[in-house]
Structure formats: C-alpha cells, structure tokens
C-alpha cells in the first residue's frame, strides 16, 4: 500500500517494507529536513464539517516548524518542533496519570495554573526527560527562558512536550543551539505543520495530522491538530503527544472543560499495549481569530458550545485512531462500539476493556473470530449488566445474542479479519449490554509478533 505524501521540491524517493506495510518514504536532499515519514490516513467521519489541509496551522494565527537539531540517537529525521500563536491563545492541557510524570509534564501543569494563555509549544523527540530529577526540570526552565527571549514573550506562555527514552535528559546544548533556526523556520503553511508533525515522532511509521472547517454559531471556525504515538499506548493517555489549535472564540474555563471531555472520548479511549507513559501531554490552544463579530462561547450548555465540542471530538478522535492504526507491529485498527449501557462512561469502560484485551488482540491477529474472548473482556470491565442481554457482532456478522452463541459462517468471519489485516483496514466489533442509552467507543490494534521484536530492540 502506498500512502500519498505532500509535494516537496528536490525529493529523493525510496520504498521499504516494514511490518507488512509498504510505505513510500521520502527524504529531502538538503540538510535542513531529511527522512520524512508518510502521513497517516485521515480517519474522521462524515459530518457537518469539511476536512482541510494544514494540521496545526489550519486555524488562523498559528505557525509551526520542525527541524533536525541533533537530539535523536540515530539518523537525521527532524526531532525538534515548535508551534506558535500570533496572539495570546486560550490554553488547556491534559496529562498522564502516571505518578512518575516527566519534567515537562510537571512544568506544563504549573504553567497552566499560572496563565490562562500560551503563545508557544516546544516539542523534542529523542529524550523523554522523565525520571531525571531536579536537573531535568531545570533543563526545561532553561530551554523555556531561552526561547522566551527569542520570541519576546513571557516564559509562562511557553509549554513543553518531550518524548523518547525515559531516564535521559534533553540534549540541552543541541536544543538551545537549534532554537534560533527553529524560530526562523516558523510558517503558517501546510509544510510548516507537516514538518512539525514529523519532528515529534519516535517509533511511529507515519505522521499524524488532521484539520477541519465547520460552522459554529454562524462563524466559520477551523480546528487542527497533530499527534505522535505508536507504542506504550493505554487509556489515561498514552505515550503520546498532541497539539490541537483552533481559532474559535471561547472562554478559558469552557475551553478547558471541553478539552478534557474530548480527551476522555478520544486519547483516553485508545490502547496498544497496556502501558501508560510518563510523558502523555495534549495541549490545546484557541486564538479566537475566527471572527471579531463572534460572540464568545461562555457556557458549556450553549448550542455553540455543543457544535464546537463535536468538532473538537472529531479532530481528537481522528488523531487517536491514527495512533491506534499505527500501533507497533499492528496490521489493523480495531474499533469497539458498546451500546445499551446506563451511561456513556460505563459504555466507554466496557469498550476500553475489550480493546485492551491481549487475548482479543491476539485472536484478531490470528484471524480467529473468538467471540468468547470478547464476551469475557466485556464481563470483567467492572460494569454490571445482565449477561442474558449480551450481544456481540463482528462487522455485520452476529456471533452472540441473548447471552448465547449464534450459528455463523466461521470462514466468512475469519475472512473479514484477514481482509482487514491484509489492507491495514478497520475491524469493527459491536457489543450491546442492555437497553440503556449509553454508548461509547474505544480503539486499539491487533497484537503481532512484531510488537515484541520492536520493543525488544528499543533502547531502554
């Protein structure tokens, strides 16, 4: 399968096969940018929005850049990214629940407590700067202070994300030396967003970026985002970083609540391997530049807030699904939809349980329609339901109903799984646990031999 890549001049194309996925990877012949990744497929549903180009620079007021600063242990793939806003942007963040939180996570939490706005997000790949003590935290402070002088903004308006090897401090000298060029490279173009999306990746085989345009309260708004993640992915965030930008006009308290709701419906609903990272961070910025005539969204219960929430959900879920699709060693995306629960939260909990089951994931990789594993994972989710109302379908093939196995074409079910694996498509599992109105989704991927190989060889 060949995925499309954006146009860049003077490109040298090569092809390689990795974990049963054929990708066309291209490298720019200059030293400024090399070893670009292909883009993940766009995984957003149809709706009252339009998918557009631009990622984090699609919304008005935002610029981005990515370059190689010498932070990675190998190669010259971009490893340093910067996203900036021309104005003070309303800021929000969501972070790992891991108590061994990385230095940049601790810093961002404090910065968001101090200021309701931010102007920049600095991201490095190569070193996680987690479990690095006070020295690692001081590295963050020094990098922020240096960047604030170059950008001429307050230090507390700069947020930081890091990804890479735990226990390794940032290569501070390399980062500091790269900051002037990084700032000079800032662009509101699609290319600026694309280079930043590549720079934040680690074991990812694709970059993840998406943007949409929609109507909110009579104004045209844009929301875009980028994310990274492939392994160490589990609910309560994952080893994933994300930046989301919008030009919607929204109050800080409402925006921060919206972001947490969307994170719970997206990044907290994906799982690859059951490991919760030390560095999970999603930063969301709102420039408010969609229109000076727009009324500010000041109530979470307003019609306009509902429209913006839906758009934010779509972007974050699109990025989250791209992460699961790109799971280390994975051959397919798995989408679990649970209905009939008493609440959305209970449905989401059951969906997460099934998506995270190693036995379910292994069965899907083996193209085995083993509905018993699905039923068992639903049952141990910690959500009470009447097992006599349990219903399980694989695609449009009914496997279990009324708590009992159903007669089905096993060959057809196995072929459904096989086709998804051969084309890196989506396996859809539908579960009903009762008569309630609660519905929730979770996403994961199958578990292959390659997952063990990748992580056995990864430097720790």
Curated annotation (Swiss-Prot):
Enzyme Commission numbers on file: 2.3.1.35, 2.3.1.1
Active site per UniProt: 239 (nucleophile)
GO terms under cellular component: chloroplast
Annotated metabolic or biological route of this protein: Amino-acid biosynthesis; L-arginine biosynthesis; L-ornithine and N-acetyl-L-glutamate from L-glutamate and N(2)-acetyl-L-ornithine (cyclic): step 1/1; Amino-acid biosynthesis; L-arginine biosynthesis; N(2)-acetyl-L-ornithine from L-glutamate: step 1/4
Reactions it catalyzes: N(2)-acetyl-L-ornithine + L-glutamate = N-acetyl-L-glutamate + L-ornithine; L-glutamate + acetyl-CoA = N-acetyl-L-glutamate + CoA + H(+)
Subunit structure: Heterodimer of an alpha and a beta chain.
Biological process per Gene Ontology, one example term: L-arginine biosynthetic process
CDD domains for the chain: OAT
Site (Cleavage): 238-239
Subcellular location: Plastid, Chloroplast
Highest taxon above the source species: Eukaryota
Species this protein is from: Citrullus lanatus (Watermelon)
Transit peptide start-stop: 1-26
Temperature dependence as stated in the record: Optimum temperature is 70 degrees Celsius.
Pfam families hit by this protein: ArgJ (PF01960)
InterPro entries the UniProt entry points to: Arg_biosynth_ArgJ (IPR002813), ArgJ-like_dom_sf (IPR016117), ArgJ_beta_C (IPR042195)
Keyword Chloroplast: yes
Comment on pH dependence: Optimum pH is 7.0.
Key words, A-Z: Acyltransferase, Amino-acid biosynthesis, Arginine biosynthesis, Autocatalytic cleavage, Chloroplast, Multifunctional enzyme, Plastid, Transferase, Transit peptide
Keyword Plastid: yes
Protein name as it appears in the record: Arginine biosynthesis bifunctional protein ArgJ, chloroplastic
GO MF annotations, alphabetized: glutamate N-acetyltransferase activity; L-glutamate N-acetyltransferase activity
Family according to the record: Belongs to the ArgJ family.
Annotated binding of substrate, by residue: 202, 228, 239, 328, 455, 460
Role of this protein: Catalyzes two activities which are involved in the cyclic version of arginine biosynthesis: the synthesis of acetylglutamate from glutamate and acetyl-CoA, and of ornithine by transacetylation between acetylornithine and glutamate.
Site feature Involved in the stabilization of negative charge on the oxyanion by the formation of the oxyanion hole, where: 163-164
């Amino acid at each position: 399968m060949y995925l499309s890549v954006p146009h860049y001049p003077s490109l040298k194309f090569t092809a390689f096969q990795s974990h049963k996925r054929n990708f066309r990877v291209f490298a720019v012949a200059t030293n400024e940018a090399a070893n670009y990744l292909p883009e993940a497929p766009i995984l957003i549903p149809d709706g009252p929005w339009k998918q557009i180009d631009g990622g984090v620079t699609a919304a008005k007021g935002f610029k981005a850049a990515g370059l190689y600063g010498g932070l990675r242990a190998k190669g010259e793939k971009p490893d340093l990214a910067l996203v900036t806003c021309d104005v003070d942007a309303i800021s929000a963040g969501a972070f790992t629940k891991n108590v061994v939180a990385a230095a940049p996570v601790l810093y961002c939490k404090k910065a968001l407590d101090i200021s309701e706005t931010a102007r920049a997000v600095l991201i490095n790949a190569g070193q996680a700067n987690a479990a690095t003590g006070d020295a690692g935290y001081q590295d963050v402070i020094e990098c922020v202070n240096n960047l604030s002088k170059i950008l001429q903004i307050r230090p507390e308006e700069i947020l930081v994300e890091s990804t890479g090897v735990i226990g390794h401090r940032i290569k501070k000298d390399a980062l500091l030396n790269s900051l002037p060029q990084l700032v000079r490279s800032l662009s509101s173009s699609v290319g600026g967003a694309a280079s930043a999306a590549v720079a934040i990746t680690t074991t990812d085989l694709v970059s993840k970026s998406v943007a949409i345009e929609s109507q909110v309260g009579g104004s045209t708004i844009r929301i875009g985002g980028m994310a990274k993640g492939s392994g160490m992915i589990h609910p309560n965030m994952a080893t994933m970083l994300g930046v989301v930008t919008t030009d919607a006009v929204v109050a800080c308290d409402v925006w921060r609540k919206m972001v947490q709701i969307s994170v719970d419906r997206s990044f907290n609903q994906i799982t690859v391997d059951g490991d919760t990272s030390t560095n999970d961070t999603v930063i969301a910025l709102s420039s408010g530049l969609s229109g000076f005539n727009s009324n500010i969204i000041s109530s979470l219960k307003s019609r306009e807030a509902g429209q913006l929430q839906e758009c934010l959900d779509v972007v974050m879920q699109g990025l989250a699904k791209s992460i699961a699709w790109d799971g280390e060693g994975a051959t397919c995306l798995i989408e679990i939809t649970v209905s009939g629960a008493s609440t959305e939260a209970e449905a989401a909990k059951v969906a997460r349980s099934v998506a995270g089951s190693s036995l379910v994931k292994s069965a899907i990789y083996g193209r085995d329609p083993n509905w018993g594993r699905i039923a068992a994972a639903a049952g141990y989710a910690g959500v009470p339901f009447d097992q006599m109302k349990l219903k399980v379908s694989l695609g449009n093939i009914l496997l279990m109903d009324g708590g009992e196995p159903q007669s089905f074409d096993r060959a057809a079910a196995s072929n459904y799984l096989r086709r998804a694996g051969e084309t890196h498509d989506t396996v859809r599992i539908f579960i009903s646990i009762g008569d309630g109105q609660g519905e929730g989704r979770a996403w994961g991927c199958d578990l292959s031999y390659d997952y063990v190989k990748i992580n056995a060889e990864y430097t720790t």
